C-alpha cells in the first residue's frame, strides 16, 4: 500500500509480494479479523485498518523524537570533525538514511535523507551487524552472501574486521570501503519505541583527515553522543 494505491485486491497483493493468491487470501482474511486491514465491499479490495494506521503513527512519532534529540549533538560533532554525521536505520539488508548533518568544511560529502546504503561495506551497516544477536546476524550474512556471491569474500572480510573493531574500540570502521574518498566510523544503538536498530556514523573526506583522527579524537565523542541519545530516549540522559 502507498499513497497512490490505497486499496488493493488479493491478486494485486499476490503479485507485489510474489505469493500464491490462495496464501494471500488467507492472510488478508486473518489481517482483516484482527484490524490490520479493512475490507471494502464495493470494490472487493482492502485498505489499511485502524490497527495498522495507529501502529505506523506511533512509529513515526518515535522516529521524529529520535531525530529531534539527535540533531543538535550530531551537528556539533559534524562541525568538530569537519565532516558529515549520519543517522541510519536498518531495513532488511540495507540501511536507510534518516538524518544527516554536514560541516561547512565538507561540501563534497552528501547523503540524501531516505537514501539506502549497503550493510556490508558502510560503517553504518557494520556497526548494526556488530550488535545483532549471533543467530540473527548469521541469517543476515547468508542473505547478504546470496545477493553478491562474487563480491562476498571481500565483503565478508570487511564485515569481520568491523565486528572485531566494535569489540576492541567500540565502533566499526569503513576506510574507503564504500566510497573510496571517504573514511567513516559508526556506533549502533537500540532506540526503542518499536523502531529497528539504528546507528550513527561520522565520515570525513580522505583528503582532509587521517583515520587516526577519527579513531583518536572523533570516536570518543561519537560513543558519548550515542550513549547519551540511548539514555535520553528512555528519559535518563544528560546532554553530552
What residues fall within each predicted segment?
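Short, basic/aromatic recognition patches
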Residues: 69-77, 141-187, 232
Amino acid at each position: 500500500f502507498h499513497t497512490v494505491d490505497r486499496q488493493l485486491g488479493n491478486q494485486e497483493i499476490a503479485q507485489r509480494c510474489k505469493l500464491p493468491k490462495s496464501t494471500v487470501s488467507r492472510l488478508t482474511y486473518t489481517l482483516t479479523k484482527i484490524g490490520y486491514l479493512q475490507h471494502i465491499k464495493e470494490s472487493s479490495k482492502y485498505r489499511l485498518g485502524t490497527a495498522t494506521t495507529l501502529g505506523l503513527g506511533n512509529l513515526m512519532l518515535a522516529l521524529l523524537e529520535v531525530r529531534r534529540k539527535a540533531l543538535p549533538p550530531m551537528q556539533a560533532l559534524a562541525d568538530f570533525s569537519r565532516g558529515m554525521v549520519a543517522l541510519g536505520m536498518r531495513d532488511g539488508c540495507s540501511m536507510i538514511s534518516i538524518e544527516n548533518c554536514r560541516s561547512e568544511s565538507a561540501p563534497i560529502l552528501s547523503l540524501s535523507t531516505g537514501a539506502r546504503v549497503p550493510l556490508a561495506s558502510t560503517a553504518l551497516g557494520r556497526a548494526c551487524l556488530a550488535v545483532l544477536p549471533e543467530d540473527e546476524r548469521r541469517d543476515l550474512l547468508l542473505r547478504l552472501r546470496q545477493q553478491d556471491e562474487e563480491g562476498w569474500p571481500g565483503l565478508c572480510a570487511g564485515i569481520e574486521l568491523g565486528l572485531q573493531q566494535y569489540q576492541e574500540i567500540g565502533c566499526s570502521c569503513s576506510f574507503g570501503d564504500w566510497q573510496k574518498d571517504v573514511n567513516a566510523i559508526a556506533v549502533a544503538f537500540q532506540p526503542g519505541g518499536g523502531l529497528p536498530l539504528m546507528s550513527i556514523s561520522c565520515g570525513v573526506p580522505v583528503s582532509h583527515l587521517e583515520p587516526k583522527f577519527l579513531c583518536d579524537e572523533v570516536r570518543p565523542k561519537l560513543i558519548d553522543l550515542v550513549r547519551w541519545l540511548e539514555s535520553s530516549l528512555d528519559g535518563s540522559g544528560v546532554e553530552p
